[in-house]
């Protein structure tokens, strides 16, 4: 018997259907459930029956909510709900949102958009819209619309404003219903070009030199949403030729690239990063890309591949280039292996760009400790205008590029800590992330407040 047929059966005996899956059904009752109801449910479903005892007030509130949803469905049918969802997605697209948060509360449905790394709220919607909007999104992603107690993940694609778009969806049970976060998957409007990333000339030269080597490990590090994927794909595109066999293992496959052999992991089927990586190494690759190093086994396979004639590119979640080296050691990788295989580490962050239409110099300057930045930094203000609304428009990447030189290899083998490694690298000319941010402030591209928001202020001497 289908879920929609169980609902009236339960109501006939003053019970309420809460949940139904392949093994169990859950019902709420005010008193002891009637024997007739239990017998009918067992006969109709052949499933285990879980019973919750609710107060009459709880039963009445849930019933009223269901009646409101039913009335809403009559007045705002599937076509209108679908159109309403499309309007939300189109508005997110117009505002260049990377994520959409759909959050039911007791009194309204809240929708927030993450634009340039910061959440902005849209006008509140009626709470009765929560259930049909969430159901519509779950249908698009082929999720179980009857499952409200467990998180679910999925993907879907649709055409909006004449463009094919892909979304990743994640649900989470909360106090007043299911919260949904939609991630707009990478739409590559810009060319995947190393020149367009925003690296300085010396950083770009070091990147190209490592990328053109026949073997070695290149790591791009930073938190989620820091632009690592675009940097990684731009590097791969720079080497994407008929004479080069490029294989990747990803989760998910975010940017399809012609000429590359891309594999998406599937843990449920046993297709993990390390199992795919082992298989890729039997595919005669010249270049291997691992979407993310998540565990010691994947790290060890990647490092061994980089030692045996393969160029390997991957990402790692660390705060700086020097911390990357100690993080690999904490994962159990031997120092000699890191020293011999690693060729370059890039740390990066994204900061919001000041709107060029309303940006102005405040006329004052900020003095930082000399060890952080030797010159006064201009203070910029941007109040917001019809072009940006918030004072910022778009984002730019800040980079810290660490080539693994012979001196640094020796320091790794000796077991230098992150602070000692950074001192060694800065003495050799490396620009830190904070220094990269200060340079962008001097150029009027971003503000000190934005750099501090993203990076904090390092400890000065």
Pin down the residues of each PLM region.
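Polyanionic, low-complexity intrinsically disordered segments
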Residues: 1-43, 152-161, 166-172, 460
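Short alpha-helical interface patches
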Residues: 12-13, 21, 45-46, 51-68, ...
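A short, compositionally biased micro-patch
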Residues: 20-21, 44, 105, 213
